[in-house]
């Protein structure tokens, strides 16, 4: 088992630089320099990552551990930042970079709206927040943003925004403390899966209430900043595979339009 896991990781590690290496070999070959051009398909494709949809119990355990984050003299605001950061990512379905790069002026506490700037595809959007999160953001703003003395809503070191590495490192620690197993590099669960869980849990709630899913999909698309409705429809299939008891309802909405999660390219969304 250990050998197989190591092999899969090795394939994924090697697959990424193959394209530039192949182009370099072609460039050398055109200039008369003997070079072996690695044929397409020489390496197996990396295993497709299947998003981890956190259960309600896992989310509760994860957020409980963020609340227990301790003071650190090197990053004196960490214990205040982390509980709100990860709740904001989940409750608003944000990408990690969208959250960590929020500036203080991007958060309108009075209106309860986040201004997401230069997101995936270079797009901006406004994200309304729920009433409970708005209260939490207001308290956080009063106790943290004014004290940080910087431009960032979630400040890191030296008045700079949090790095993705810092976010991931803290997230892995909270997962371990919450007893949520992690499969190692490339196998998750990941921070981005909080965004997936947001979409799936909203769809699950809409199905339970008998809402018109076809009418609400464009709303979810806009809220999450998807460039295509197909990216949003992907979550219908993910919802069905995560909660088989509503798969018949999902199938009536999408039929066979959206491919199974275990096939096709990996969706970052």
Task: Please place each PLM-identified region on the residue numbering.
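Single conserved hydrophobic/aromatic residue that forms the stacking wall/gate
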Residues: 1-14
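Flexible interdomain linker/hinge and immediately adjacent N-terminus
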Residues: 33-68, 117-120, 156-160
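Catalytic-site neighborhood detector that most strongly recognizes the C-terminal catalytic loop/helix
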Residues: 53, 118, 224-255
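Basic, Lys/Arg- and aromatic-enriched nucleic-acid-binding interface segment
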Residues: 64-96, 120-123, 148
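Short, basic (Lys/Arg/His-rich) helix/loop patches that form interaction surfaces
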Residues: 71-75, 127, 169-222
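Conserved tyrosine-mediated DNA breakage-rejoining catalytic core shared by Y-recombinases
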Residues: 92, 97, 101-139, 143
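C-terminal catalytic core of Y-nucleophile DNA break-rejoin enzymes
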Residues: 121-138, 151-173, 186-190
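C-terminal secondary-structure termini that scaffold catalytic or DNA-interacting sites
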Residues: 250-269
């Amino acid at each position: 088992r250990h050998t197989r896991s190591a092999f899969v990781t090795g394939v994924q590690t090697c697959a990424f630089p193959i394209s530039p290496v192949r182009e370099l070999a072609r460039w050398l070959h055109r200039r008369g320099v003997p070079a072996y051009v690695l044929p397409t398909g020489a390496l197996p494709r990396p295993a497709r990552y299947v998003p981890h949809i956190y259960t309600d119990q896992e989310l509760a355990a994860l957020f409980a551990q963020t609340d227990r984050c301790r003071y650190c003299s090197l990053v004196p605001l960490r214990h205040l930042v982390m509980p709100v950061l990860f709740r904001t990512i989940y409750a608003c379905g944000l990408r990690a970079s969208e959250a960590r790069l929020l500036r203080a002026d991007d958060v309108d506490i009075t209106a309860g709206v986040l201004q997401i700037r230069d997101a995936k595809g270079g797009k901006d959007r406004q994200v309304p927040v729920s009433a409970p999160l708005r209260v939490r953001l207001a308290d956080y703003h009063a106790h943290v943003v004014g004290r940080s003395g910087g431009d960032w809503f979630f400040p890191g070191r030296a008045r700079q925004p949090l790095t993705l590495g810092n976010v991931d490192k803290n997230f892995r620690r909270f997962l371990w403390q919450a007893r949520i197993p992690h499969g190692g590099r490339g196998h998750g669960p990941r921070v981005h899966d909080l965004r997936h869980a947001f979409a799936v849990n909203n769809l699950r709630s809409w199905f339970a209430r008998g809402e018109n899913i076809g009418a609400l999909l464009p709303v979810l698309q806009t809220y999450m900043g998807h460039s295509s409705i197909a990216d949003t429809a992907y979550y219908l299939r993910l919802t069905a595979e995560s909660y088989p008891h509503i798969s018949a309802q999902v199938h009536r909405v999408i039929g066979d339009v959206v491919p199974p999660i275990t096939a096709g390219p990996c969706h970052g969304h």
